[in-house]
């Protein structure tokens, strides 16, 4: 290890590598003339190799798929890029360069960090396809280039007004560029020279540079033989200064882009120089929380830094590996750790399922003693010490009072790994020993203009470096093995201890803690080289007692002041192993072994996913609500029916939409189907006649009696008792045998016919009686019809009950019963019939009662559909007439018996008539 260190000391004689902005292959391809619409565009590009989500290569045509991906702005004045360009090497071996294969708007692309330790990005298109791209660059350049890509992703995800600089002059967006701007960085070896590369420097309106420094910058520009291509200086500012700039509205001028999310100032016109474009390349190369160097940052040739005797030679920005802090100088506040955590956490691919342990999370605050990850692993002999407050890596910008304790590592990630959960070295609550006086702001013997203690402790009372309350690792554990220079198989690295001249008890600077094996042993089975910070001459105590105090158990963890500052992480290209200039004695070597586990720990903020399940419950009910209403009014019947269908459904479905997320859906459906049916029925045909039932019945009897047709068969028609309950029921109490024929009976069911009855030719006499016995002697014959009286009211003939005294008397005024002729006319009196008639007369004589009969003839009621009796409005319900068919038997005696049976019913009908008449009359 000592031999390797001694060999590296000779390399600075050959030249110091410096970061130089150059044209990338994709930018060169656009300048060949084949893509004329794509004029010189502000672009940032890098070479990538397509891999799988686990890091394995993807083979296309039996070879790895290499490509160049760049982001560019379609207009030179745009602050943010808006298109993504992808080029691939030409398949023809004769053709050199790239072939542009893809040009996709950035609105349709989502770019994120997939794995920090493997330098892998994830490209997801709007169609859903995902591609994993690993950065393809030399080992000494990959860290810085990947850091630029991370900053680009951060800028694309946050609103631009938070970081866009303010300019005094603006130019049109489509102003063509004089030459193609640089699109990438390259670490180039320079000849031995103490001059640094001078590039254009941005002037903020609220910052003025001394006239002497401007003259020096112009002199350096004239003495240069080579000039950087394009605007290669990453201009630097801080978010705290943006607040000051916003307070000066007179100095603000912004240009609105037609796109709503990209409205910023883009181009500035210097007073005496050519057009300097605030390009995408310059924006990406800067960091979010850095500011422009102040006069204290870039000192003159007489100024010294940290008492090392190394001189920052140029006041202008230096783009070199030795001292890139010229444009990475900055200051941080108490808000910077939060901003750093928030910006870096948003870059991670939250949707990726194969995040490694190094990319699973980030510490909310940077560790107490963050080990730097420089981009170059080659230390230099007369190396310039990093100025105080130089920012190293994507961590929070350090305070200007913090020295740079630097460590080298080939491919250690620039972001600190949180998933390893290494216990950081916290600040103990004990007071410093008597020999260690807490310094205020003067740690160095040859004090520079800047006051810088080695590592400020909380409240300036604890010599150890304070650690955050979170489980932030004090040592980054990348997946790739870190090695010093080319000695990768070595398991441990040498860490130079401070020289013997430094008295430990009189140390006036707080100690920089070292990490013992116990602090990192539980996290790695593989032994990898891990480099600890090599502090300056007056920054590290040598006594074992001080080491034990610096590494004391955490007693004050979580009690961090608001103004607490931390050591920054380094950027690749910074030399780390420093040599003591006070003497040439060999430095003792301290060997530290670390272990890290291969266990991949998946840590997520979401809850643990539950086992997926699906439960579905369905319940459905159909209810029929039916309501029927029937109305009957004056022989009109109406029926209404209302039906309602009620459908009640309950659906409960529980299914996992996402891993660990259960969704419960409760759906209730209520459907009402109303079906309304209305049926109105008119009165029956029996009730639709304008005549009363009594009038129609008597009219039917009269028509039947006057009919000339003599049917062969006769039927007995018996009138119901309710028809006899009329004032004239005494006269119509006789039952007559009426022949029943379909043609004649249809009158009751068909259309009503107005029929007038022929009046009788005789007048009624009170209590006129006629014996029933005359019926047997009087032959049946046709009734003579007197002339009709059309104007007179129809009169219904009445018959009185016969008496025994007048059985053989024939009255002239007596009219025969209007019955149709029947075969009874041919019958002769027989002894059997006389006997039956005599019995009938005796029965009639016994039941005979005198009754006064009204002499007024019965008039037909008015023609209206309802039949009313007297003063009562009672509705008469229809009743069917009882039809009895009398068969014509062979013997005449049976017919006589049937006739006598019908006649025997008359006294009972008359008796019921007398009993019902008072009610009907009432």
UniProtKB/Swiss-Prot annotation:
Q: Which cysteines are joined by disulfide bonds?
A: none
Locate the compositionally biased regions of type Low complexity: 442-458, 471-495
Protein family (similarity comment): Belongs to the GARIN family.
Q: Which PANTHER family match?
A: GOLGI-ASSOCIATED RAB2 INTERACTOR PROTEIN 5B (PTHR22574:SF12), PTHR22574
**Compositional bias (Basic and acidic residues) spans?**
758-788
Q: Which organism is it from?
A: Homo sapiens
Q: Which gene encodes it?
A: GARIN5B
The name on file for this protein is Golgi-associated RAB2 interactor protein 5B
Q: What InterPro entries does UniProt report for this protein, alphabetically?
A: GARIL-like_Rab2B-bd (IPR022168)
Region described as Disordered: 244-264, 292-317, 373-404, 424-597, 758-830, 842-869
List all Pro residues biased stretches. 431-441, 496-507
Spell out the Polar residues composition-biased ranges: 292-305
